[in-house]
């Protein structure tokens, strides 16, 4: 069965980080395909007028075939209206990009995509992209906890304006971002160029995802091998030691690899307990889960109290039945999160 849902990419980043430059690059590129970009306000979007074919009060059509619209009412209504006009043949699009305002917490937007029945049936989360200004990244992270949260839950971080700062400053900023989000891929971009294909297909929340895609999304493309990290009481080696800013201290993350499939009831009890106690502080949970008695694994993904329906991966090679689970949370320390995850290991062989 072909998954016909439209992929949605969430684009976050603070004012001045370079989101507009990136959007204009996407909208100008004829190889992008037909993309519908949703912005908060046209006046704030900074669209390049040389790229505009025609515009109305609600929609701007770009020369590349892409379109841009502003939020009218709530987000679910805006996306539903796009689909209605697509069905009527008025517009055409193959994917959606939602640009958040600088201060926006991405969590509620992701939850909307999960809980709205129409959106859940017609769209799927394709990835969270966060743009970080290399020139002002440190000061923004120091002053705005929302910026820290945006970096912590990203699937991909784009460092903009890297031509304006030294290599050593870039490396320090990368280290700080990786301390917040150890599995994230970080790439550099100047003026948003050459990124189009990199932005898409970040998530494994579809049944056609390959094993490598699922692993890249869950544990990162370049995980560092830590021989003791999968044993209780041992943590991965720390990266370059830097003073930890106060906002960063509020973010905790932990992961676990389980060698054997676990009972479904054990996972359900663990997750229900975690959500009941600290659900509002869970920024993101994602993972690959093997359940006893079922050959193919499930991809799981949730934000706070809300979770996607699990997606079973059909293209998983037999033999590897290890579950991988990652949690990112605020106001929970890494040891606290790790202790919670270790409850799954306790029942792994029951």
Regions found by a protein language model. Give the residues of each.
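Small/polar loops that bind or transfer phosphate-bearing groups
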Residues: 39, 71, 98, 161, ...
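Conserved beta-strand/loop subsegment of P-loop NTPase cores
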Residues: 36-38, 92-97, 121-132, 151-162, ...
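Non-catalytic interfacial helical region
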Residues: 108-112, 134-147, 151, 159, ...
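C-terminal accessory "lid"/substrate-recognition subdomains
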Residues: 2, 149, 156, 165-323, ...
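Nucleotide-state-sensitive switch-loop elements of NTP-binding domains
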Residues: 2-140
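Short secondary-structure boundary/capping segments
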Residues: 51, 120-121, 148-149, 316-317
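Structural motif
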Residues: 88, 120, 146-149, 246
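A secondary-structure boundary/capping signal
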Residues: 11, 38, 133, 160-161, ...
């Amino acid at each position: 069965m072909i998954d016909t849902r439209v992929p949605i990419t969430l684009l976050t980043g603070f004012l001045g980080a370079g989101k507009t430059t990136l959007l204009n690059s996407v909208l100008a590129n004829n190889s992008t395909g037909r993309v519908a970009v949703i912005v908060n306000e046209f006046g704030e979007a900074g669209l390049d007028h040389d790229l505009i074919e025609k515009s109305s009060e609600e929609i701007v059509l770009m020369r590349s075939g892409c379109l841009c619209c502003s939020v009218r009412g709530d987000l679910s209504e805006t996306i539903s209206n796009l689909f209605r006009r697509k069905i009527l043949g008025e517009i055409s699009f193959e994917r959606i990009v939602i640009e958040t305002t600088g201060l926006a917490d991405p969590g509620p937007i992701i939850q909307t995509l999960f809980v709205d029945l129409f959106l859940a049936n017609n769209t799927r989360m394709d990835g969270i992209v966060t743009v970080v200004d290399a020139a002002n990244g440190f000061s923004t992270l120091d002053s705005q906890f929302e910026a820290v949260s945006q970096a912590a839950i990203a699937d991909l971080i784009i460092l903009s304006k890297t031509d304006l700062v030294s290599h050593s400053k870039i490396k320090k900023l990368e280290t700080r971002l990786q301390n917040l989000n150890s599995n994230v891929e970080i790439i550099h971009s100047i003026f948003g160029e050459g990124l189009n294909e990199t932005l898409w297909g970040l998530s494994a929340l579809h049944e056609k995802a390959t094993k490598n895609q699922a692993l890249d999304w869950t544990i990162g493309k370049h995980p560092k091998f830590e021989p003791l990290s999968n044993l209780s009481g041992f943590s991965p080696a720390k990266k370059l030691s830097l003073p930890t800013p106060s906002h960063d201290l509020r973010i905790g993350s932990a992961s676990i690899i389980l060698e054997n499939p676990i009972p479904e009831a054990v996972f359900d009890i663990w997750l229900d307990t975690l959500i009941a106690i600290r659900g509002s502080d869970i920024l993101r949970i994602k993972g690959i889960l093997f359940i006893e008695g079922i050959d193919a694994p499930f991809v799981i993904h949730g934000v706070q109290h809300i979770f996607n329906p699990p997606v079973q991966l059909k293209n998983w090679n037999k033999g590897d039945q290890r579950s991988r689970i990652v949690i990112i949370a605020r106001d929970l320390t890494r040891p606290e999160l790790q202790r919670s995850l270790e409850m799954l290991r306790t029942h792994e062989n029951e």
